[in-house]
Amino acid sequence: QAQLALCVLDVDHFKQVNDHWGHAIGDELLCHLTRLLSQFFPDAMIARFGGEEFALMVPHCPVPVLLKRLEGLRQQLRQQPLSREVPLFVRASFGVINVGRLSMDEALCEADRQLYQAKNTGRDKIVSQDA
């Protein structure tokens, strides 16, 4: 069975970004994140779940490899401002699983559980049951 890793991610404190910077900047942040996701994961299927939550399905990718790539993305988000005009640094939380034999509903549920563990234990981190 081929490896299939799933990551669900959520921008931390996105409502505060919209409240402080405005919805146009919030939209710019989401576009910026989408571009970075496409650059870091050209082989992934990327979906926006609404709001500021995204899912990545990465085929032929063991979870430890995905975790390394996600950490690179997380660090770039932390260190690179949204733009010169907007000194906003993005923080995000990530939940990662190996899909294995789970149905897609089960996989999304489990990845979401991992995401909320990241959120509930300090945010701006990656949590995986498979680490």
Model-predicted segments: where are they?
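Conserved long alpha-helical elements within nucleotide-processing catalytic cores of c-di-GMP signaling
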Residues: Q1-A5, D12-Q39, A47-G51, A55-L56, ...
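Short, conserved catalytic or interaction motifs in soluble domains
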Residues: D19, P59, L82, K119-N120
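Hydrophobic/aromatic docking surface of two-component receiver
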Residues: H60-C61, L102
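Catalytic-core segments of nucleotide cyclases and related cyclic-nucleotide turnover enzymes
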Residues: L67, E71, I97-A131
